[in-house]
């Protein structure tokens, strides 16, 4: 199941992302965050990844935002 959820992210990383300049505001890119969240939390990791993508905009804070050990849709402040 996790491999099926990760496959579209890997497709994005391999074929779509290289076409655009890097724009992620966080350390651990949003696509890598999504993969780690899925590996750690299963389907809930998809929700965490989508929440992370919504947080990645020009007006957000930058820095480390690692995948938390427990499910959360909020930014992980442990990394700072």
Swiss-Prot record:
<comment type="similarity">
    <text>Belongs to the UPF0161 family.</text>
</comment>
<keyword id="KW-0472">Membrane</keyword>
<dbReference type="GO" id="GO:0005886">
    <property type="term" value="C:plasma membrane"/>
</dbReference>
<comment type="function">
    <text>Could be involved in insertion of integral membrane proteins into the membrane.</text>
</comment>
<dbReference type="InterPro" id="IPR002696">
    <property type="entry name" value="Membr_insert_effic_factor_YidD"/>
</dbReference>
<dbReference type="Pfam" id="PF01809">
    <property type="entry name" value="YidD"/>
</dbReference>
<keyword id="KW-1003">Cell membrane</keyword>
<feature type="region of interest" description="Disordered">
    <location>
        <begin position="60"/>
        <end position="80"/>
    </location>
</feature>
<protein>
    <recommendedName>
        <fullName>Putative membrane protein insertion efficiency factor</fullName>
    </recommendedName>
</protein>
<feature type="compositionally biased region" description="Basic and acidic residues">
    <location>
        <begin position="62"/>
        <end position="80"/>
    </location>
</feature>
